[in-house]
């Protein structure tokens, strides 16, 4: 039904998303319902099939998040990217989902900015996705004005709602900083 509505707007890019997982393997409490995520995967697979048939985009949050959970649970059986209800993502889980979504859109490897300065030659040799001006080089100082065309994502280190993890904790399980948040400066 909803597919027919979507088809009325061919100029709009459609992306279907497979749900985050129900974490039935973490041991942070005793309220796991084995088999629940298997049922969720049936819905994920249905959405993936619909996306393929209609030539729409698809992002699977479930399988990559399950893989991360299981990898981390090998060392810490209480680890989870999900909250206390085992289905809704925790703060670090949300960053993992954002990373997976952005990566699926082809944004991995896009620079925030990259600057290279030749100090001896007193010149900017690279300024990707930014503008560098007013370069001044002396024997003990180098200054310049930097105008970014984009900004890095500010990783949150705060705890919310008594969660065990922060958004920053996700950086240990996904290469977000390298793939999505690189802002480089090199002086030679």
Predicted features by range, described:
Residues 25-26, 68-72, 124-128:
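Short, solvent-exposed polar/charged micro-motifs at secondary-structure junctions
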Residues 2-40:
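Active-site segments of SGNH/GDSL-like serine hydrolases
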Residues 23-26, 61-62, 80, 162-165:
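Generic detector of short, locally flexible boundary/turn motifs and exposed helical patches
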Residues 9-12, 56, 86, 91:
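Generic hydrophobic/packing signal
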Residues 13-20, 37-79, 95-109:
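Extracellular serine-dependent O-acyl
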Residues 28, 32, 39, 75-82, ...:
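Generic alpha-helix detector with strongest preference for long hydrophobic helices that associate
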Residues 79-188:
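Conserved catalytic region of serine esterases and O-acyltransferases that act on ester linkages
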């Amino acid at each position: 039904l909803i597919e027919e509505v979507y088809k009325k707007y061919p100029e709009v890019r459609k992306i279907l998303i497979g749900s985050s997982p129900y974490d039935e393997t973490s041991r942070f409490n005793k309220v796991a319902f084995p088999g629940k995520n298997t049922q969720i995967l049936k819905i994920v697979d249905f959405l993936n099939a619909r996306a393929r048939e209609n030539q729409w985009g698809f992002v699977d949050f479930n399988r990559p998040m399950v893989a991360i959970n299981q990898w981390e649970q090998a060392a810490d059986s209480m680890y989870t990217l999900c909250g206390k209800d085992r289905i809704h993502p925790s703060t670090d889980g949300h960053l993992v989902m954002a990373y997976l979504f952005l990566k699926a859109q082809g944004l991995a490897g896009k620079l925030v900015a990259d600057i290279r300065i030749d100090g001896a030659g007193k010149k900017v040799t690279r300024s990707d996705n930014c503008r560098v001006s007013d370069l001044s080089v002396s024997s003990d100082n180098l200054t310049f004005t930097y105008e970014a065309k984009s900004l890095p994502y500010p990783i949150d280190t705060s705890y919310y709602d008594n969660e065990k993890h922060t958004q920053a904790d996700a950086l240990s399980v996904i290469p977000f900083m390298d793939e999505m948040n690189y802002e480089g400066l090199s002086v030679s």
